[in-house]
Amino acid sequence: MKVLLLVQKEQRAILDRLYEGIAEHCDCDTRWLSSAEQRNLRGYFRREVDVTQYDRIVFFLRFKQEIRQAGFIRTIPNLVILEHDAYQNYIPCKYTGKFSAHYRRLPWARVISSGFVVSQRLREEGFEAVFVPKGYDQALLQPQTRERDIELAFVGSTNSVAYSGRKALLDELAQVEPLVVTRTKSGEEYCATLNRIRFFVSADVGMGEYMIKNFEAMACGCVLLAFDQGEAENQALGFKDKVNVVFYKDIPQLQEKLAELRANPQLAADIARNGQELAVSQFSFARIGQRIVEVLQPPLRPRAPLSLLETLRLKLGV
């Protein structure tokens, strides 16, 4: 299968291993698009892409730019959209309902969502949505033999509106527990910091799915204290409470379970080990890339014929 994979050149997360994981399992032409190229997809395709050469054209671009160009995107054959932010469709933020509105203009496109329940909800709306979770960079994030001298911590951003629930929970927890909240550079510093943390607090409040940090912390051997996203999401990922992760729904429950783990270091060590084994076997970008290619394979829904205006604009390149 010949795949054109269009990704963002300027992206905070380092996802090169994910793209390599996809390329391992298909004939993949990966292109890194600048912000300017993403803003003018019609021009980019006119200059750089022969759509007849590809069995699948996969977008992993900024949603903000996609929604402004749905008229052109409708004309692209064999379209698949890889989307890690579709949970924002269902939470109070500037993109509430916007993903549904966008996909209604592209009803034949396959959407690969990183949330199990999100993909279910999209399917209920009539879209062809499939689930492949987020993962972690197996080359960058590995366990080290350093001392875990930070007992309880969160590493990452709390700034955006989508993270307002995260910030509120972490602020509340910091009032009653010795929580460290910090940020690091990507890469070695991030890996080293995760390897110093015994209990990693994941606070994906109100998001309905697990963000990438959960898998990164598990891979580095932290005990993951995860805000519970519900039975369906947990089952889809193989997450089991006090077996490979520790779930909580509020601060009192988190404190109760934390006290149990402090009193039983062997239980904590077992959970960390089981979580790490699950992450390594199921959530490395090598494995996630393979899963993405698997869901690219089935035939796509037939695309509606182009209108006369769409055909004319394609021919004229305007």
What is the role of each PLM region?
Residues 1-54, 59-74, 78-237, 317:
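Nucleotide-sugar donor-binding catalytic core of glycosyltransferases
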Residues 5, 18, 22, 154, ...:
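Ligand-binding pocket scaffold of soluble enzyme catalytic domains
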Residues 101-102, 191, 251, 265, ...:
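Non-membrane alpha-helical structural segments and their capping/turn regions in soluble enzymes
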Residues 243-251, 260-265:
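Conserved acidic donor-binding segment of nucleotide-sugar-dependent glycosyltransferases
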